[in-house]
């Protein structure tokens, strides 16, 4: 059986797709990659929150599958909207890497070491919100482009520090390319939904093949996170962090944060449960936060994000 994987063309996307290709080949399948450019890849001069719409890094890959040009697509799960197009399913979630965000700098080892007015690069409203809440004295500037481009901007002195996901740095083997790479504690910066996991989207006719790649622990954790986001109706470009952790004793902790992009107002909550009732946890946490004003806070956050970039 021959399979075609739809992928973006960035170094990280190709690493991820080749990683899945190798696993499928170990099961005896013949696999090829087909590269597509997404809307998010083409528009590099505009903050993601202003581009609008969901599926900025997935739609073109999904269209290829629906046309029959590809059988599956490998995504960074955090980029995958909670609602998929009709005719496609999320067939597998791979084992997660460490989910932390990381501070990268040539001069400063930790967030606490950054001087007042330090320039920190990130386009993520979620990271911006949590950074400014902790350090309202620093300056956040937008940072777009692939991982290499972002690191080059840091090394060229455009930024005192930048924030990237630890998982991508590890997968690309570039943890040593910057003097300081400091994973930020998840209680300080809650990750994005699905961060550090790969989501394999596919047509239903190949789901039996794809599900061989599924990691149960990661699938449970990310189900909770995606359900939480879905119930809040929050896309990939709103300031929401959520992290579900399935522990060795089958207990589950889910923590989340919502707030304004300038960090002036944050709403945090957490819930405890077990593997047996994991289907309910995302819903319960979302409803608890909605009762405490989450919907209104998200509306204000969206308005603030658009106003700041006008």
From Swiss-Prot:
Binding note for cofactor: Binds 1 dipyrromethane group covalently.
Cofactor entry: dipyrromethane
Location of S-(dipyrrolylmethanemethyl)cysteine modifications: 236
Annotated metabolic or biological route of this protein: Porphyrin-containing compound metabolism; protoporphyrin-IX biosynthesis; coproporphyrinogen-III from 5-aminolevulinate: step 2/4
Disulfide bonds, paired cysteine numbers: none
InterPro entries in the record: HemC, Porphobilin_deaminase_cofac_BS, Porphobilin_deaminase_N, Porphobilinogen_deaminase_C, Porphobilinogen_deaminase_C_sf
Top EC group: transferase
Recorded GO MF terms: hydroxymethylbilane synthase activity
EC number(s) from the headed UniProt entry: 2.5.1.61
Gene Ontology biological-process annotations: protoporphyrinogen IX biosynthetic process
Coiled coil: none
Key word Transferase present: yes
GO cellular component: cytoplasm
Catalytic activity: 4 porphobilinogen + H2O = hydroxymethylbilane + 4 NH4(+)
Annotated family: Belongs to the HMBS family.
Role, per record: Tetrapolymerization of the monopyrrole PBG into the hydroxymethylbilane pre-uroporphyrinogen in several discrete steps.
Note: The porphobilinogen subunits are added to the dipyrromethane group.
UniProt xrefs under HAMAP family: Porphobil_deam (MF_00260)
Name by which UniProt lists this protein: Porphobilinogen deaminase
Underlying gene: hemC
